[in-house]
Swiss-Prot record:
Record function comment: Catalyzes the synthesis of the hydroxymethylpyrimidine phosphate (HMP-P) moiety of thiamine from aminoimidazole ribotide (AIR) in a radical S-adenosyl-L-methionine (SAM)-dependent reaction.
Protein name: Phosphomethylpyrimidine synthase
Cofactors required: [4Fe-4S] cluster
EC numbers for this chain: 4.1.99.17
Keyword Metal-binding (UniProt): yes
Keywords carried by this UniProt record: 4Fe-4S, Iron, Iron-sulfur, Lyase, Metal-binding, S-adenosyl-L-methionine, Thiamine biosynthesis, Zinc
Binding residue positions for substrate: 253, 282, 311, 347, 367-369, 408-411, 447, 474
GO biological process: thiamine biosynthetic process; thiamine diphosphate biosynthetic process
Length: 648
């Protein structure tokens, strides 16, 4: 199925499921130093602790929210108009950009003038593209290196902290046991951060960073250890950061192909992905109407959008890689930069000398972009135009603040090929290209594998940190085994959690359809939830400040049999509630002190609570209560004849 013009021109509507607030949640905004710095978060309301457990108040939990205005009941959502230009005033105030009279890319102008695409196009070019003024650099890295803290950096600092300090203060004020409760709920295991600066040199917990400040954000961007993907032509985006010293982020891939999916379906996938926690979205469309699909997605996306420009360039030469030219690729970069793409995957590290190294692989070259460039190199027997024109690409990137995502075109497609000479040779080249981009103050992250068994994952991370000078690592998984088609979200989730712990800044999700087909909405959600789990597990393992707050809150709710809070504090409240209700559907089961796993008589948490209640009644400690209970049972055993078994 391809795009439906009538649907897009007249009847485009947002997916109703994507705009419904999550249970017991509401959108809140934290205001920064100026009124238009309004940082969104999701507030999850909790019930009071039952009287039998002390009856204290449980204040709301605040969690990172990527859903943009879509889950705000007060927002007016019309995907035909796009989202509000959140960052426009900040961009204007810097005075270093100019508004263009219209599109400057040749292909962009052709599409705008083509009557055949009129009904497909996003309604009107309501915001003319912008570009840096002559001689100016508009990247967040450039500002950071000038010592400037931008509104984007302040926004990010507030967002990363998730109102953790306010939450702990609200616990302290909750009653006579408030201080004790705050200490309990704020407790966190010391992490092992493998040298990440935000977590201090001492893994025992001293000298740890306890709060993300705007200055810390600036310093991390300035040194290249983090990036803020925020094209000046995507003012709708809510600023976020990708770096090993911040919360681990996840990316969701969407995009049509030549045989399936429409523009409307891809917009729905985007809104669905960000509802469940996608921090960025990559549009990997390879079918018809790539330009129009991307415009609809960007104008309606509150998260950064990434692309692989070589895919569209290939479409322009009818799929013949050898016919690609620098001029076609350059025009494609400008076309997409003017639309507002925030980061480009560019496979400039695929060099002619590395291609023969893949000959003895089990699975050869599995990256689409990598195979395109390898074919071009062999056809022309020269270095790729991406490598030869890299400095010119940097000039384009810094005129729009597009970040590099330097592609791993020679990543392993099987664990057999992991960490081979081709993969590592390309990685070393990516480190060299990073230094060139940084000379231009262009932001860079590095893409990584792929398929890697667990014992080789840390080597990947260590080499990347060394050769790429701590530029953020962005990995696809890695998949830790090749035996589970249909379950590769799990095989890769294992590797993702590990490499996130070791220092990867962003994890590219894998869905159950990996290697099998184009994912639908259900697959997108499954991949997102799996990777949110992996990212959170990595944050916990690193000891990221406040990472354990949500775990502690859910564990407390579980022990107190606050079922609704258990559902709502989880990553997927809908599935948790569905599983519980399969066996205990009645409302009365939502307050029961057991579930269907153990039943009312064998619930370990209920037994623990009975011991505590007995101890309180007897005026003794829990240890003494357990000892007393054992003595009583011993007397009963002797009185009944010291028989292990009794007939009923």
């Amino acid at each position: 199925m391809n795009a439906n013009p009538k649907f897009l021109s007249a009847d485009a509507r947002v997916d109703a499921a994507a705009v419904a607030p999550l249970p017991n949640s509401r959108k809140v905004y934290v205001t920064g130093s100026q009124p238009d710095i309004r940082v969104p978060m999701r507030e999850i309301t909790q019930a009071d602790t039952p009287t039998s457990f002390g009856g204290e108040k449980n204040p709301p939990i605040y969690v990172y929210d990527t859903s943009g205005p879509y889950t705000d009941p007060d927002a007016k959502i019309d995907i035909r108009a796009g989202l509000p230009a959140l960052r426009q005033r900040w961009i204007d105030a810097r005075g270093d950009t100019e508004t263009l009279a219209g599109l400057t890319s040749e292909y962009g102008r052709e599409r705008a003038a083509d009557p055949a695409t009129a009904e497909l196009r996003f309604p009107d070019l309501h915001r003319h593209p912008r570009r840096a003024k002559a001689g100016r650099n508009v990247t967040q890295m450039h500002y950071a290196r000038q010592g400037i803290i931008t509104p984007e950096m302040e926004f990010i600092a507030i967002r990363e902290n998730q109102r953790r300090a306010e939450y702990l203060e609200s616990l302290k004020a909750s009653g006579p046991n408030g201080a004790k409760l705050a200490a309990m709920m704020g407790r966190q295991h010391a992490g092992q951060a493998f040298g990440a600066a935000a977590f201090g040199a001492n893994e025992a917990g001293t000298n740890m960073l306890t709060e993300i400040t705007p200055e810390f954000v600036r310093s991390e961007v300035a040194c290249g250890r983090a990036i803020i993907p925020a094209n000046i032509n995507h003012p709708e985006t809510e600023p976020m950061i990708i770096g090993r010293n911040f919360l681990v982020k996840i990316n969701a891939n969407i995009g049509n192909s030549a045989v399936t999916s429409s523009i409307g379906e891809e917009v729905d996938k985007m809104t669905w992905a960000i509802r469940w926690g996608g921090d960025t979205v990559m549009d990997l469309s390879t079918g018809k109407h790539i330009h129009e699909t991307r415009e609809w997605i960007i104008r309606n996306s509150p998260v950064p959008i990434g692309t692989v420009p070589i895919y569209q360039a290939l479409e322009k030469v009818n799929g013949k890689a050898e016919d690609l030219t620098w001029e076609i690729f350059r025009d494609t970069l400008i076309e997409q930069a003017e639309q507002g793409v925030d980061y480009f995957t560019i496979h400039a590290g695929v060099r002619l000398q590395y291609v023969p190294l893949t000959a003895n692989r089990m699975t050869g070259i599995v990256s689409r972009g990598g195979s395109i460039m390898a074919k071009w190199c062999l056809a022309h027997h020269k270095e790729s135009f991406l490598y030869e024109h890299f400095e010119e690409i940097c000039e384009i990137m810094k005129a729009y603040d597009v970040s590099f995502s330097l592609g791993d075109g020679l990543r392993p497609g099987s664990i057999y090929d992991a960490n081979d000479e081709a993969q590592l040779g390309e990685l070393k080249t990516l480190g060299e290209l990073t230094q060139i981009a940084w000379k231009h103050d262009v932001q860079v992250m590095i893409e990584g594998p792929g398929h890697v068994p667990m014992q080789l994952i840390k080597e990947n991370m260590d080499l990347q940190l060394d050769w790429c000078k701590e530029a953020p690592f962005y990995t696809l998984g890695p998949l830790t085994t090749d035996i589970a088609p249909g379950y590769d979200h799990i095989t890769s989730g294992i590797g993702a959690a590990m490499i996130g712990w070791f220092g990867t800044a962003m994890l590219c999700y894998v869905t159950p359809k990996e290697h099998l087909g184009l994912p639908n909405k259900d697959d997108v959600k499954e991949g997102i939830i799996t990777y949110k789990l992996a990212a959170h597990a990595a944050d916990l393992a690193k000891g990221h400040p406040g990472a354990q707050v949500r775990d502690n809150a859910l564990s407390k709710a579980r022990f107190e049999f606050r079922w609704e809070d258990q559902f709502n504090l989880g990553l997927d409240p809908d599935k948790a509630r569905e599983f519980h209700d399969e066996t205990l559907p009645k409302d009365s089961a939502k307050v029961a002190h057991f579930c269907s796993m153990c039943g009312p008589h064998f619930c370990s948490m209920k037994i623990t609570q009975d011991v505590r209640e007995f101890a309180a009644q007897q005026g003794m400690s829990e240890d003494d209560a357990l000892k007393k209970g054992m003595e009583v049972k011993a007397v009963e055993f002797v009185k009944t004849g010291s028989e292990i078994y009794h007939r009923q």
